Amino acid sequence: STLPAVAEELLREIKMAFQETSQVPDDLLLGLKFIFGPCAVPALDLVDQRSVTRVRSPSGRILYQVLGSSGKLYTCYSSCHFCTCPAFGFSVLQKSESLLCKHILAVYLSQAMGACQELAVSEEQLTNILLAEEEDEG
């Protein structure tokens, strides 16, 4: 599953602008708010707080953990646009009101701005992270 082309293009433009000037121009910030709505500003706050961690195992499997504003850690999968937070389940999956939640948007913005924390874990640690998420849900 992919984001709409306009969203993909906006994230590409943000990445290019940030690489050149180390900031995101106002027009792209407005575009972010237009496309992603109310989750744009909170997502930028998460990026500013360096709340996004890229977790990588030796086999190359990657997931992201985002420390939410509530202090809870959410697991995000950028490859399939999925987050374990309740807002994702409700606004994105059930109601189709949003493209994604603030946590996944923060992951994409952190990637674009090179603002991800990095964490190398063993395969066993990665498995434990994934299993812990399943227990939280069930």
Kindly label every feature range from the protein language model.
Residues 1-138:
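Long, low-complexity, compositionally biased intrinsically disordered regions
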